[in-house]
């Protein structure tokens, strides 16, 4: 198969074909995910929680993100690698450019920034300099202390209206992809229709252009022992991790995941 690029993802959206994304932090899992047909490997700052055992993503550094990106690159077999810029790594224009360069040099094909409409300026700066950006809206874990916990975002009409406006503004600024986390399914569907760029969901219903899960969650592993509402354990009925990965990709591609039970209402 040819390598997955931004053009590939755009074509999948235009053709109505779903995009399968999964978090990945090492070479071995990267290879297995690629063999299962995962389109995008997300080197997420979620590693701070699932690998390092922190109670949030805030302690993760750019150096750690670059290290895991390089690990994933070595095992990658054609997927697009998307890497998170961690907490406060893009607080200024200079930080955004320097830290994005560090991650791209480590092997990322694209970087992800969490926030809202204020991301327009760093996205514009990065896009103009050849760095593809995915904007992350909705529940943004780096802002967990402001949000008051890990809660669904966009349930109030004012919030929903602002999120729709932010999505369109960030596309206009140059964002090449959008990720919506813990957003009411109806709102996510509206945003997906309103923008031309691919929209990936996690806890955002089935109408987005693709889905992403944290690898540990989809394998039934959790430090807390309780999976979020939007997670399905793909190890159930499977005898191997390879089987679970293939089942995840198939379920995303054929639209059977997520089901209505995995989404949120307004």
Curated annotation (Swiss-Prot):
PANTHER family: 3-METHYL-2-OXOBUTANOATE HYDROXYMETHYLTRANSFERASE
Alphabetical GO biological process terms: pantothenate biosynthetic process
Known partners and oligomeric status: Homodecamer; pentamer of dimers.
EC number: 2.1.2.11
Catalytic site positions: 181
Native source organism of the sequence: Ectopseudomonas mendocina (strain ymp) (Pseudomonas mendocina)
Entry's Gene Ontology molecular function annotations: 3-methyl-2-oxobutanoate hydroxymethyltransferase activity; magnesium ion binding
Organismal lineage: Bacteria, Pseudomonadati, Pseudomonadota, Gammaproteobacteria, Pseudomonadales
Protein name: 3-methyl-2-oxobutanoate hydroxymethyltransferase
Top-level taxon of the source organism: Bacteria
InterPro entries linked: Pantoate_hydroxy_MeTrfase (IPR003700), Pyrv/PenolPyrv_kinase-like_dom (IPR015813), Pyrv_kinase-like_dom_sf (IPR040442)
UniProt enzyme class: transferase
Catalyzed reactions per annotation: 3-methyl-2-oxobutanoate + (6R)-5,10-methylene-5,6,7,8-tetrahydrofolate + H2O = 2-dehydropantoate + (6S)-5,6,7,8-tetrahydrofolate
